[in-house]
Regions:
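Short, solvent-exposed loop/beta-turn-alpha elements that line the ligand-binding surface or hinge
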Residues: 70
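Active-site loop segments of alpha/beta catalytic cores
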Residues: 1-65, 76-320
């Protein structure tokens, strides 16, 4: 069974044997592991000036970063961030990964048309707009949705639809204390386009993983009712209890994540190891679980801590 097939079984909440699947939204520490700048950190201001040979070499080097990290750490999925982010380069990057690894890995890309928490520069203006111009927000999200689903449909026509398995929707909605969008506003402004894009992707044959950090509990019902195949992060720093979420929603949705990034960053080795084991213990029963951090392997994280997490997964994250 390929790693791709194992990820898909987890998304479908089906029984699997061997290791619980694992992957990370992003593994930024490629310089430390491979001696290469992560693809998302590269700047190609003169891309259009480059020769076809130079472009191909750059794309192959990016593909190597993605696939080598997956091989080294046993990841079953690769979240591909095309750079430059256009259709032509996305297709070529995905093709290189498929050419070099076959159908071994579940490949996904970003594809979320909904609004995230605004940054500090936009916070006040956007907050006012929620109340003063909700129809404008809805219209803008619909325009983004059309653009993203057109991209997905176009991609599905390439290589018999074999390049991409799904989309990961990465708009963040929540702070650690509460959602940015109150539940009623979330239900009116955000949930409808979220449900619509998930259905559109599913109708095309794509899987969906919905990511958001923070305290999702006040909007959990909305998220589940939008029917993504999986929910990612399950942020313990936002008070999300994986065991309780599993008990209540584990028959409806695959759960991904929950290893506390805060403890990986600042906790003791003993605290971090205990939390890693807790996530495995709470998430694995009943299947429908993909093991990962509660965010990603971000710039500044101690690689030794992720290596410890991966070692515990290899030794203990196994279905009997």
């Amino acid at each position: 069974m390929t790693e791709r097939e194992r990820i898909i079984k987890a998304l479908k909440r089906e029984k699997i044997e061997g290791h619980v699947p694992t992957f990370e939204l992003v593994f930024y520490l490629t310089m430390e592991v491979l001696g290469k700048v992560h693809p998302s950190h590269r700047s190609y201001h003169q891309w259009n000036q480059s020769s076809a040979k130079e472009k191909e070499l750059q794309l192959r080097d990016m593909a190597f970063c993605y696939t080598e990290i997956a091989k080294l750490y046993g990841h079953g999925a690769i979240f591909v961030h095309p750079n430059p982010n256009d259709f032509e380069n996305a297709v070529r990057l995905l093709r290189i990964i498929r050419e070099t690894t076959g159908m071994e890995y579940y490949l996904c890309m970003h594809g979320d048309p909904t609004f995230s928490i605004p940054n500090g520069d936009r916070m006040i203006d956007f907050s006012a707009r929620i109340y003063e111009d909700p129809e404008g927000i809805k219209t803008e999200q619909e325009q983004r949705l059309v653009k993203m689903t057109d991209f997905a449909e176009k991609l599905k026509k390439v290589d018999n639809g074999a390049l991409l398995d799904g989309f990961t929707l990465c708009a963040d909605y929540c702070f650690n204390v509460n959602p940015f969008f109150p539940p009623d506003i979330f239900g009116d402004l955000i949930a409808p386009p979220l449900a619509k894009v998930i259905k559109a992707y599913r109708d095309m044959g794509y899987y969906t993983i919905k990511h958001t950090d923070g305290n999702i509990m006040p909007i959990m019902e909305h998220l589940v009712q939008c029917k993504p195949d999986a929910l990612h992060s399950l942020d313990p720093q936002g008070g999300v209890d994986l065991k309780l979420v599993k008990q209540k929603y584990g028959d409806k949705i695959c759960l991904v994540g929950n290893v506390n990034c805060g403890l990986l960053q600042t906790g003791t080795d003993e605290e971090a190891a205990a939390d890693i084991r807790r996530a495995l213990r709470d998430g694995m029963p009943g299947y429908g679980f993909i093991f990962s951090t509660s965010n990603c392997v971000y710039t500044g994280l101690d690689l030794g801590r992720y290596n410890m997490m991966n070692k515990i997964w290899r030794e203990e994250g196994v279905y009997k």
